[in-house]
């Protein structure tokens, strides 16, 4: 699996240390093991996880501005855990409302010795952002409007929302809550992943 990950990283033009590669493979191993009992992801094949979970997460790392991020609706830690591995200088709060997912995240944190993640069990509307975050990341929300509406209290004044999407649909981007606009739409190229992938960056219009 390490060889396959290395090939995928080469295809994507991403350079990681051997330690980071080993951490990513270990994370896939834990996800595969826990998935059998906890049903954390619909992806059952570890090799497919490398593409659909690992590469699809870390491909956005160069576009994140700041050092404090929150991954809302992180599920089994996606994209937060892979991003924390490839950006050890940044801190990631991993927010999910389901206890079984947060228990898994704490196990990952323990086994991989990740000191730059904080798993939290909470509903997003009940979670206080103190201090606020540089970036709010998610691939869990059905719509951009929902993401901004539910998470508006989380970013700092100069912070951004980062939504990992398949299609970047014009009507969805035009239907943001009042006061917010699209800062950037980045087309992502994930090796061996079929279909379009985009990173939609949202910020307050006052900036």
Swiss-Prot record:
Catalytic activity: guanosine(527) in 16S rRNA + S-adenosyl-L-methionine = N(7)-methylguanosine(527) in 16S rRNA + S-adenosyl-L-homocysteine
InterPro entries, per the entry: rRNA_ssu_MeTfrase_G, SAM-dependent_MTases_sf
CDD domains assigned: AdoMet_MTases
Record-listed S-adenosyl-L-methionine binding positions: 73, 78, 124-125, 139
Alphabetized UniProt keyword annotations: Cytoplasm, Methyltransferase, rRNA processing, S-adenosyl-L-methionine, Transferase
Compartments where located: Cytoplasm
Protein name as catalogued: Ribosomal RNA small subunit methyltransferase G
Organism: Klebsiella pneumoniae (strain 342)
Lineage start: Bacteria, Pseudomonadati, Pseudomonadota, Gammaproteobacteria, Enterobacterales
Gene: rsmG
């Amino acid at each position: 699996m390490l060889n396959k990950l290395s090939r995928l990283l080469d295809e994507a033009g991403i350079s990681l240390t051997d330690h980071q590669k080993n951490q990513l493979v270990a994370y896939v191993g834990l996800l595969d093991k826990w998935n059998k009992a906890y049903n954390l992801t619909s992806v059952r094949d570890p090799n497919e996880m490398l593409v659909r979970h690992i590469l699809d997460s870390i491909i956005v790392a160069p576009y994140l501005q700041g050092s404090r991020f929150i991954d809302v609706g992180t599920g089994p830690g996606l994209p937060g855990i892979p991003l924390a591995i490839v950006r050890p200088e940044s801190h990631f709060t991993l927010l999910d409302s389901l206890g079984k997912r947060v228990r898994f995240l704490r196990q990952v944190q323990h086994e991989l010795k990740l000191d730059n993640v904080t798993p939290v069990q909470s509903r997003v509307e009940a979670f206080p952002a103190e201090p606020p975050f540089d970036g709010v990341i998610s691939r869990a929300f059905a719509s951009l409007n929902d993401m901004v509406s539910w998470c508006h209290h989380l970013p700092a004044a100069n912070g951004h929302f980062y939504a990992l999407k398949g299609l970047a649909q014009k009507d969805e981007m035009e239907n943001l809550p009042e006061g917010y606009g699209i800062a950037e739409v980045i087309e992502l190229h994930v090796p061996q992943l079929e279909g379009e992938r985009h990173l939609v960056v949202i910020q307050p219009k006052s900036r």
